[in-house]
Amino acid sequence: MSKKYAAFITALFCVFIFGFGAALLISPDRDFSQQENRYLAKFEAPTLSTLKSGEFMKDFEQYVIDQFPLRDGWIQLKAWCERLVGKQENNGVYLGTDDGQTLFAQYTKPSAEDLAKRVGYVNQLGANVEVPVYFALIPDKSYVWADRLPHRAPLVDDGSTIQESMDLTGEDVTYIDLRDAFSGDDVFYRTDHHWSLFGAFQGYEALNQAMGVETVTPEGEPTRVSDSFYGTTYSSSGAGWVRPDEIYTWVSPQGITVTAYPAGQPEPGVLYDKSYLEKKDKYSMFLGGNKPLAVLENPQATGGKLLVIRDSYSDALAPFLAQSWQEVHLFDVRYNLNSVQQYVEENHIDQVLVLFSASNFSTESNLFVMSR
């Protein structure tokens, strides 16, 4: 290697390092990444305590990673490079065999002890209340669309979490097996972990059949409201080549009253908040996003009062449930730590449904609320 060439490489390296360092200092910090759909780390001034504990360096490292100039472009470049060398995974996301158009988040199965504790909370709920309690886990996309997974992908849902949950369910709770409820190419979003409108409808049919409630097929045809949805799995994958998903609605909001409780007090809610269609988080169009509690009322329905202990999958399911139940109470344990037993009694609930995705049930830290 000639001295001139070595000097050129050294100079180029210095320009790269100092240039990006200067850009990091000059550029204003970003609060939120639309690409990754998450808040980014901010700079925290060091203190004697954080310097001694090493916490400052840990936080500063995350700050540099999050605020690195042109971060979104580098993430996509890395994904392209990984794909070109034949890798089937990037940033914890598997690339589907359909030319990488379906993205699968890695699924980590809980330990036997942890799963027993989690199902135990459901069993305690069944023992605490005097009304029927149903329990169902929604299989992960990697279970339903296993034929699209890359060969020998290790961290996927093989159905064993659901089977073991069924085996652990006590006599006071009726388990509803949804593993065979889904069919078709559109029951999940390719770029997100949630089920689509069509998957939610198939889940609704299976749940109602098990609970002995009439299934109502909405009038007309589903309406496409967005053709540019990129979900959370896409956000972490960097897979810039993937086509966007489409979002549909089907149930008319007419005749359905929604009351939301974002901070403990009732406020008028909506079945569909279409302002979210102009944002990255388009899935939050259903019910307007996460709420500790929401109540849907439909006096024309034939069912009674249903309480759903739920995660975000029920946002897309709720419009269908509102066709069958006069009242649907959506209780989100992520944000609502009140006594479920007391809620059932005070609101004269007729049936309780505990419904989570298998992945969320395996990781949610507030399931203990059900035992109160």
Residue locations for each model-derived region?
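Extracellular glycan-modifying ectodomains
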Residues: 1-372
